Amino acid sequence: MTVRKYTDQDIGELIRIWNEVVEDGIAFPQEEELNMRSGAEFFASQSYTGVAEEDGKIFGLYILHPNNIGRCGHICNASYAVSKNARGKHIGEQLVLDCLKKGKELGFRVLQFNAVVESNVHARHLYERLGFTQLGTIPGGFRMKDGYYENICPYYHEL
């Protein structure tokens, strides 16, 4: 498995994987799925979009961009998506490790996750194992697909 920069030829697969996570309604704040036009614009607008690929097949992706502007512009934010049929194979770990490296290369000093859903224990365990620090808990900060309000846990990692 390698992680590389996305190309325009990847857009269809990136949209498919992204929309799987949006449709699940338990991890991403977005409610609207991407189409070819909005997806191409979305991935191009990121500071970096990485894809996890093996034997020409894309299994996951991450997006990396500033978390804020101006005096806080040195803090970046990222989101990760792994195809449903590839989960549990440590692809997320490879995406996070590549993202940490890429964030530093791009001049960011901190990677911050704003809204890790508290019940997303696999992601939280991974982040903590990789040295991320939880900043606290925001009660009811994420509206799940079923309407339930779940706590969110912001995390950060110095680059």
Question: Which ranges hold each PLM region?
Answer:
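A short beta-loop-alpha structural element at the N-terminal edge
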Residues: 2-14
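Acetyl-CoA-dependent GNAT
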Residues: 8, 27-85, 96-97, 102, ...
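Helix-loop element at the rim of GNAT/NAT acetyltransferase active sites that forms part
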Residues: 15-32
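Terminal substrate-recognition subdomain of acyl/acetyltransferases
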Residues: 80, 138, 146-159
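Conserved acetyl-CoA-binding loop-helix of GNAT-fold acetyltransferases
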Residues: 82, 88-105, 124-129
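Conserved GNAT acetyl-CoA-binding A-motif
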Residues: 103-116
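Conserved beta-strand-loop-alpha-helix junction that forms the acyl-donor binding cleft
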Residues: 113-123, 141-146
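Conserved acetyl-CoA-binding loop of GNAT-fold acetyltransferases
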Residues: 128-138
